[in-house]
């Protein structure tokens, strides 16, 4: 049973601006493992990665119905599986979490669906 659905969209330019204006912005949003991946990337790909994680975490908080103010960015971690698909490796939810992140030249969007585990 689906218990929550959250969607977020961000302009890449606004994330890039936040990185430029606020030293430590990436460290506030990303966990240590996410930060490792972030620092291995260069240029525009770095901004896309950070924006994708930001958007995924915002979408998760909306699916939970709490907003990001009730969750910390460090409470949520998005990694990639062996095929490159993003998944929540850390999140305060015991059921199934469905995550999709997409980019264009200007925007990033994320969708999160929370599904309760039901055993028959």
Swiss-Prot record:
Gene Ontology process terms (BP): fatty acid biosynthetic process; lysine biosynthetic process via aminoadipic acid
Annotated Gene Ontology cellular component terms: cytosol
Subcellular location: Cytoplasm
Enzymatic class: transferase
Pfam family name, one: ACPS
Residues involved in Mg(2+) binding: 8, 58
UniProt xrefs under InterPro entries: 4-PPantetheinyl_Trfase_dom, 4-PPantetheinyl_Trfase_dom_sf, ACPS, P-Pant_transferase_sf, Ppantetheine-prot_Trfase_dom
Catalyzed chemical reaction(s): apo-[ACP] + CoA = holo-[ACP] + adenosine 3',5'-bisphosphate + H(+)
Cofactors named for this entry: Mg(2+)
This protein's UniProt keywords: Cytoplasm, Fatty acid biosynthesis, Fatty acid metabolism, Lipid biosynthesis, Lipid metabolism, Magnesium, Metal-binding, Transferase
GO molecular function, one term: magnesium ion binding
Coarse class of the protein's main subcellular location: cytoplasm
EC number of the protein: 2.7.8.7
Known function: Transfers the 4'-phosphopantetheine moiety from coenzyme A to a Ser of acyl-carrier-protein.
Family note: Belongs to the P-Pant transferase superfamily. AcpS family.
Assembly and oligomerization: Homotrimer.
Protein name, per record: Holo-[acyl-carrier-protein] synthase
Source organism: Streptococcus pneumoniae serotype 4 (strain ATCC BAA-334 / TIGR4)
Lineage: Bacteria, Bacillati, Bacillota, Bacilli, Lactobacillales
């Amino acid at each position: 049973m689906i218990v929550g659905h959250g969607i977020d969209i961000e302009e890449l330019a606004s994330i890039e601006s936040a990185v430029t204006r606020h030293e430590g912005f990436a460290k506030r949003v990303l966990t240590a493992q996410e930060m490792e991946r972030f620092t291995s990337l260069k240029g525009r790909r770095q901004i896309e990665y950070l924006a994708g994680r930001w958007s995924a975490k915002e979408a998760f908080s909306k699916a939970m119905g709490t907003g990001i103010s009730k969750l910390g960015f460090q409470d949520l971690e998005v990694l990639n599986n062996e095929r490159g698909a993003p998944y929540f490796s850390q999140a305060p939810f015991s059921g199934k979490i469905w995550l999709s992140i997409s980019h264009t030249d200007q925007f990033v969007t994320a969708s999160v669906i929370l599904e309760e585990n039901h055993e028959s």
